[in-house]
Design a protein with these regions (language model features):
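Helix-loop boundary and gating motifs at the non-cytosolic
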Residues: 72-130, 293-332
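Hydrophobic core of transmembrane alpha-helices in multi-pass small-molecule transporters
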Residues: 94, 162, 173-189, 300, ...
Length: 489
């Protein structure tokens, strides 16, 4: 029985009415901004009350989304029956999205403020993504054999310690070593979520569960992005230093560390019922080589394409458009909060078009905005293109696109249960390793001031990836539907 949706359009209109106010705040920041950033002098881009209002509005929106998600009222549906482990994974999502978005937005800008050049930043990103890719396949195999919780806790502890170190270390050699260490540990904890969520949910609730998790995570990322813009201003006022200085950005980065620690607690509380798997049985149980191979090829092309642009979106605004940290944070936050809202409605499209058609259509629709972003010389136009790009294509975690939860769910459902950890590890490896290659190739272009070429190359590779994905998987999606209407409780 399909549940009837209550007539609450007025509430929805009020909810969406927040969006124009966010846009107004964004444009206000541009109007007050100092147009001459030639010397990149640290100045507040707008009166402090503008950023306070923006932070307050986005905080309220994110808290409402998280509160409604926990109560199960989003889209007038009640998400009941989730297991305790699934709920713990959902509880972890806001902490994860908040900490990662804050650190990733600020860290590249922090390196530039310390005095490193563009080529060093590109080298750091390339090493980090490459090592991330190298570690996830072994981590996926280990999670299949010994349990996902154990692998996660060990890897996340190492990642937290190494991330703490890079905030204080300024020696270039040690920074590159730590980039590799963080990448290796990140691969260990990145493989836990999707397989575990599939294992802890029913087929008829998975689309909603994955969309809900993605919406909460990206909603929290919006708060992290805005905090990354506001915190340097706050520390600059507190310590009488420039908001674009290395110390202001370092202090803001330190705020992300305790949030990382909090995101680890829900995984520690998970009660995992795991039986060790015999290695020989595991090898013999891998059967879906064709599907796993096609997922790997798609991810490889996606990673290579995104590597030319996505790891450096913040640098694009900082170096090319001379935007302040506060402006970058507000633009990134707007993209994240809109993604969080729209993601929750994607299951409606999936119900009509199917999973593969929905993912392919959304991804291909975002390619023009990515290319136009690389051609932008105006911060307002670039901000609009960035928001559209994040909505449709996405970026590095946690800035995923609106169709990414469905894409991940489909990948977990077309393979066997014993293959899921390994499949997820292979997908991560094939997206992260090529992303490191793309970042290394894009570095010289960006250092020379050429942003258009890498964005165009990345867009072309991305288009090829999802055309191949559609041609292979559209028939499988048609033969094996898993989307079912939610039953009334």
């Amino acid at each position: 029985m399909i549940r009837r949706i209550p007539n609450d359009q007025g509430i929805k209109m009020k909810r969406w009415g927040i969006v124009p106010s966010l846009v107004a705040v964004l444009f206000a920041s541009f109007a007050w901004a100092d147009g001459d950033h030639g010397a990149h002098t640290p100045k507040m881009a707008a009166p402090f009350w503008v950023w306070a209002v923006g932070l307050g509005v986005l905080t309220v929106v994110v808290l409402i989304l998280i509160r409604q998600a926990k109560r199960g009222t989003l889209m007038s549906e009640r998400f009941r029956g989730f297991s305790r482990n699934a709920r713990l994974l959902l509880i972890r999502s806001p902490f994860s999205g908040l900490s990662v978005s804050l650190i990733r937005l600020l860290f590249n800008l922090y390196l530039l403020a310390v005095g490193f050049d563009m080529l060093f930043v590109a080298k750091f990103a390339a090493i980090n993504w490459t090592c991330h890719g190298l570690s996830v396949i072994p981590s996926g195999i280990l999670s299949d054999l010994f349990g996902r919780r154990r692998v996660f806790l060990l890897a996340y502890t190492g990642n937290l310690l190494a991330t703490t170190a890079i905030v204080f270390v300024t020696d270039p050699t040690w920074l590159l070593i730590l980039a590799a260490v963080i990448g290796l540990f990140e691969g260990g904890h990145a493989i836990v979520g999707p397989p575990f969520m599939v294992e802890q949910s029913r087929p008829d609730e998975r689309v909603h569960l994955f969309s809900l998790n993605g919406g909460i995570q990206v909603g929290a990322a919006s708060l992290g992005n805005l905090a990354a813009g506001v915190l340097p201003l706050a520390f600059a006022a507190l310590f009488d230093i420039g908001p674009e200085s290395a110390w202001a950005r370092r202090a803001a980065l330190m705020c992300g560390l305790p949030i990382m620690l909090l995101s680890m607690i829900p995984i520690y509380l998970i009660r995992e019922e795991w039986r060790p798997m015999n290695i020989r049985r595991w090898v013999e149980g891998i059967e879906n080589y064709g599907r796993i191979g096609m997922l790997a090829l798609t991810e490889g092309l996606v990673g290579l394409g995104l590597g030319f642009s996505a790891p450096f979106f913040n640098i694009f605004f900082d170096q090319h458009l001379k935007a302040s940290t506060a402006q970058i944070g507000l633009i990134f936050a707007l993209g994240s909060i809109l993604t969080a809202m729209v993601t929750l409605f994607v299951p409606i499209v999936v119900h009509r078009l199917g999973r593969v058609r929905t993912v392919t259509f959304v991804k291909l629709l975002g390619i023009p905005s990515l290319i136009l972003l690389g051609m932008s010389y105006d911060i307002v136009w670039a901000g609009a293109m960035y928001v559209i790009t994040i909505l449709l294509i996405g970026g590095p975690f946690p800035n995923k696109g609106i169709s990414d939860p469905i894409y991940t769910l489909f990948a977990m459902e077309v393979v066997k249960e014993r293959e899921r950890g390994t499949t997820n590890g292979i997908m991560h490896a094939f997206v992260e390793f090529p992303m490191g290659i793309g970042a290394a190739l894009a570095g010289p272009f960006m250092a020379a001031g050429d942003w258009q070429t890498p964005y165009m190359i990345g867009g072309g590779i991305f288009a090829v990836a999802f055309i191949l994905y559609y041609l292979y998987f559209v028939r499988i999606d048609g033969r094996e539907p898993v989307l079912q209407p939610a039953t009334a409780s």
